[in-house]
Amino acid sequence: MSGPDEPFHNLEKVLDELIERGYNTIRICAAPILLYGDLGVAANALAISSMGGAVGEGTRWYNPRGGITIDLQSRLFELLALAKKKSVWVILSSWEYQQSPAFSETSDWNDALMDIPPGMRFEVLAQCWVRMLEEIKARGLRDVIAYVELHNEVDLSLVGVNGRWTDSDHWDRKTSMEDAIGLLRSAHPDLLHTTSYGIPPFLHMDTAPSNSQVAHHHLYVYGVLQALFDWSQIRAEPPVYPTAEMKSLLRPDAPDFDTYRAGVKAWTLDATITPLSYLYASDYANGAAWDAWLYRNYALHELEMRRGIDYRLSAISTWSKLHGVPAVIGEGWVGFTPAASEFEDGPIGQEITQYAVQSARELDFWGIVVGSNRAPHHSGWSDISHQLSINEEFIHGGTRE
């Protein structure tokens, strides 16, 4: 989304806007393996593309226009230098085994990543981070780093496995993650190092790496949104999908699923690990129909969602205090809604946000997000007053009603 007229084309403008909204930190995929892993992929002339056809156009995260070429390393250091100029912190992360390569014109980046054996990926990541951090320091940019996150959502990515992460993987991958974090801590002891979970192991928090220096987790409560997913069978496969219920949530111009599927570049689905059925539902979502369903059914799930927020924040807070490290919610609160849906940006979504942020503050969390629908490429970015009030409340406090 860095092309002309796209949201991230002018990085200085983006940073000015986030400061205006009360933010002081950004979190990015710094692509450490691509830039410092000797993959043989030309990162200095990385061609950016859409996922093919209309795929991703109705989502909040998979809709770059493409058609541009980026010198990724130059772009990274431009951003870090601007962050230093603006006094903005940067959380360095990697989405390389989850989404980032899907927006490349070719599969070269993704293929090179997948050629690394799963059992070696955490170690390779750590080695690449070590080299990247050395260069960041050499350029005088060390002080903009809030902390280093080994990889985004290890449990919802391909960083440790080829396929879905199972319950046993929480234990099986713990040592590999601890070794990787240990390598980083040894090489760069002046920085904080951690990893992140998409669905934190709330019942088994001991499976999280014990040497993490930040308890970084994501908290999507879903609740009523999960009920919509279940009702519509959003993850079903043809011929069951799309169900009549799902069709009732689509625009009249939605093509049949087979026609839609023919437009996608198949390898990009492997790179995103996102079901095509979800992308289809988002790309052709009737936003009003989605929102009407969510509002009609919210009362059935309100208590469950609030309790879910309380329980999960408490589990994360307890772990962080036992280990003497700060706690951060790096993504959240409701879940992945189509771009056409305004539920999370509306009064109920804002109420959920306020409840979660107040709860996190009462538990002494170090950092939170206003919501994962608040970024320059989201419609909610235009609501300056809401973001500013939430950020000021987290920093300065408030009393729960």
What are these regions (language model features)?
Residues V130, E134, G140, Y147, ...:
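Extracellular glycoside hydrolase catalytic/binding regions
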